Amino acid sequence: MRNTELIEWFRQSAPYVNMHRHKTFVIMLDGNAIAHPNFINITNDISLLHSLGIKLVIVFGARCQIENLLKQNNISSSYHHNIRVTDSNMLEIIKQAVGGLHYDIFSRLSLRLPHSPVLNVVSSNAILAQPLGVIDGVDYGLSGKIRRINIEAIQQQLAQNAIVVIGPIAPSVTGKMFNLAFEEIATQLAIKLKVDKLIAFCDRQGLLDEQGKVISDIHPREAKQHLKKFIQQGDYHHSAARFLQAAIDVCHAGIKRSHLISYQTDGSLLQELFSRDGVGTQLSEASSECIRLATSFDIAGLLNLIRPLEDQGLLVKRSREQLEMEISQYTIIERDGIVIACAALIHYPAEKMAEMACVAVHPDYRDSARGDILLEAIKRRAYKLNIEKLFVLTTQTIQWFQERGFVQIQPTDLPVEKQRHYNYQRMSKVLMLALDN
């Protein structure tokens, strides 16, 4: 990464550093993630999150390690509803696998980066289990489910600046150990702790669309359709499918956001949390992006967006004072607290006309539909004001507006007040759209 790229990334990440500080995240790591060569980088990134003041609970699974140990001991497994039926011999193998991974996680988190503080990593016995029992005539043996979680104990550990690590086995009230699905543990912990995020490291970089591109944001309702496809295609064993169910469940329970990212990609955790669009898939009941009327608090963001375009001569220069006086005219698209697009509606009531002015979209989003979204929002505002004609002045985007129904007119067709201020040196083209009220 060149110095300029590093500086730009660091500047863009600053709002997210403040946004995530003192928040609580549950991180899901399955056995494949822990066994992957990139795991050392994942633990370094987890340490970095902790140093930034983020409270972390790591919930890990051991499915692939358990399978390998069972094969080595010539023990076969049976499943019912994708849950392992566990007997006493298997449980000893499971405890061995889980104990080994516990040690691996602790040792990796103890490998500090140079000059970094010592991490306080603790194991929690806050989970109390009970047997699954008999379902559909199948006795699950020592496979269990959560009976109770001592949330207060975990909160105390987090308050003491500890990273809490929880594995997929837990005792019952009688002291008998049970094998639990770590997805259930992560889901219930996230819900009962009321965390800010659930982050799952999968075998793929989130969910993909029909073109094979990562879906950056998705509503849980749409995510359910992807889950159905996984099940129909027999792909439920993939971690992306199993973790997707957990992400959907916690979103429905009120957790603001869940993320699916790849454990195979170096830096995916940092890119997902500290950049506008991330690298994986974010699930949220409320989108991270919204379109709304601007307020005085948006002026700094507006200036950051339009200044480069003004310097290039694409927009007429506007002072901060002018923006402050005209802020009520602006509609913005905001993403994670950052203004990524804007447009103003300037009303000329005598002629029942209005100008769509200061149209700007951040370079990262110009290939998307943000311009169309802005235009539709401006048209809706215009309808409410009984505006009959919407016009724009442009030097570079003539074709874009023509493709959306605007036709070229003469400056003399503008409202009288606008004609007085028309800049004949700039020679902007004037385009008009008739609005059907």
Swiss-Prot record:
Pathway: Amino-acid biosynthesis; L-arginine biosynthesis; N(2)-acetyl-L-ornithine from L-glutamate: step 1/4. Its EC number is 2.3.1.1. The keyword Iron does not apply. The keyword Transferase applies. It comes from the Bacteria. Keywords: Acyltransferase, Amino-acid biosynthesis, Arginine biosynthesis, Cytoplasm, Transferase. One of its GO terms (molecular function) is L-glutamate N-acetyltransferase activity. GO terms for cellular component: cytoplasm. It is found in: Cytoplasm. Belongs to the acetyltransferase family. ArgA subfamily. In bacteria which possess the bifunctional enzyme ornithine acetyltransferase/N-acetylglutamate synthase (ArgJ), ArgA fulfills an anaplerotic role. This is Amino-acid acetyltransferase. The gene is argA.
